[in-house]
Design a protein with these regions (language model features):
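Catalytic-domain carbohydrate-binding cleft regions of carbohydrate-active enzymes
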Residues: 1-251
C-alpha cells in the first residue's frame, strides 16, 4: 500500500445568490463563519479555506462587525485563507480587464483582513483562459487549483504544469471528478469513517503524481462540522502507513 501524506482542506463553497436571495444567503454565511471562527479558535491545528473569494469577508463583517479582531487574527496566522479573488470569476465570459480588477480588489480586501491566499483557486469555472498563468504571475500567485473546465478522462493525474501565452507556467492541482465535495463523507457518520477513507484512498492513490494529496472537506453552503476536531488522528488510526494534517492550499 502506497504511503501518502494527506492534506485535509476544510472549506465551503459559497454562492452569494442562488436558490435563496442574497439576504438569505448572508444570514447563512453569518452562521457559517461564526462556526468557522469558533472551531479555529478551539483547535490550533485546524485550517479553513474561504472559497477563494474575499467578498465573503466583507459580507460577514457587514453583519458581524464585532468579529473583525478575531477574523483578522486568524487570517494573519494563515489559518483562515482568504482570496485571492474578490469574487470567484467566470474566466471566459468577462474581459481580461475584469479579471485583473477582480484580483486587484481581492488583494486589497484580503490584505486588509490580514493575509491573502497565494493559490489561484478556480474550482467552478467551465473553462480557463490561456493567459491564466500570466495573470497569476502578475499577482504573485504561485500555483492553481481547478476542477471543472479541464476534463476528467480516465488516466488523468492530479497535477500538471499550465503554460501561458509567454514563458510563464505554474503547477496546477486538478481536483478529482467529485471535486471540492469529495471528502465530505469523512465528517459524516463516524462508524463509516474506515469505509469512507478506504474508498477515497484508492481514488487518490491512483491519480497521485506525488505522495502528497489534498482532500477537500466541504460542500456548497456547508458549515464546518465539529467532527473535524481530531479527524487527522482518527484517520491515522485507520491508515497507519500514511500521515494526515490540516493544511491550507499554500501549505
Amino acid at each position: 500500500m502506497k504511503r501518502l501524506t494527506v492534506h485535509l482542506i476544510p472549506h465551503t463553497h459559497w454562492d452569494r445568490e442562488w436558490y435563496l436571495t442574497s439576504a438569505g444567503f448572508t444570514v447563512r454565511l453569518a452562521d457559517a463563519l461564526d462556526r468557522v471562527l469558533a472551531l479555529l479558535e478551539r483547535d490550533p491545528s485546524l485550517r479553513f479555506h474561504l472559497d477563494g473569494q474575499a467578498v465573503l469577508v466583507e459580507d460577514y463583517l457587514a453583519v458581524r462587525p464585532d468579529a473583525r479582531p478575531r477574523l483578522e487574527a486568524l487570517a494573519r496566522t494563515g489559518r483562515l485563507a482568504i482570496g485571492p479573488w474578490y469574487v470567484l470569476a467566470d474566466e471566459l465570459i468577462p474581459g481580461g480587464e475584469s479579471l485583473i480588477r477582480n484580483l486587484l480588489i481581492g488583494r486589497r480586501v484580503a490584505g486588509a483582513a490580514g493575509g491573502r491566499c497565494l493559490t489561484l483557486y478556480c474550482p467552478d469555472a467551465f473553462g480557463h483562459p490561456g493567459i491564466g498563468p500570466d495573470l497569476a504571475a502578475e499577482f504573485g500567485l504561485t500555483a492553481a487549483v481547478v476542477w471543472r473546465g479541464v476534463g476528467a478522462a480516465a488516466g488523468h493525474r492530479d497535477r500538471f504544469r499550465w503554460t501561458g501565452r509567454g514563458k510563464t507556467s505554474l503547477v496546477v492541482l486538478h481536483l478529482p471528478p467529485a471535486g471540492y465535495e469529495i471528502g465530505i463523507g469523512l465528517v459524516d457518520d463516524p462508524a463509516d469513517l474506515a469505509t469512507a477513507w478506504g474508498r477515497l484512498r484508492s481514488e487518490f492513490a491512483e491519480r497521485a503524481t506525488t505522495d502528497h494529496v489534498a482532500v477537500f472537506i466541504g460542500a456548497d453552503h456547508h458549515e464546518p462540522s465539529d467532527r473535524l476536531i481530531g479527524l487527522p488522528d482518527r484517520l491515522a488510526a485507520i491508515d497507519a502507513r500514511s500521515s494526515f494534517r490540516f493544511s491550507t492550499l499554500d501549505e
